[in-house]
Regions:
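ALDH superfamily catalytic-core signature
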Residues: 1-102
Length: 102
């Protein structure tokens, strides 16, 4: 997803979160990269972070759950390894899901 400087930040953030996290991130068209061009980067990252922080994570059978948990400890470990790898390569972790408390 590419977000240009004249984009509607709220619409772009809503779209990015929906595309990345909708259907528990298991869509064949789920996104994993958002390219923010120019000055839009900081407000977009903040808007996406706010939305992710407010996702309701819980069992899929609970009506208010928006995202289910990872299916196994093995899967969680793999995700943690991806986050650690990105951080080691210089990425800034904005929403850290390694130790989810909900």
């Amino acid at each position: 997803m590419v977000v240009l400087p004249d984009a509607d930040i709220d619409l772009a953030a809503d779209s990015a979160v929906s595309a990345a996290y909708g259907s528990a991130g298991e869509r064949c068209m789920a996104i994993s990269v958002v390219v923010a061009v120019g000055e839009v980067a900081e407000p977009l990252v903040n808007a996406i972070s706010d939305r992710i922080d407010n996702l309701k994570i819980g069992p899929g059978m609970q009506p208010d759950s928006e995202m289910g948990p990872l299916i196994s400890e093995e899967h969680r470990s793999r995700v943690v390894d991806y986050i650690n790898s990105g951080e080691a390569e210089g990425a800034t972790v904005v929403c850290d899901g390694r130790m989810h408390s909900r």
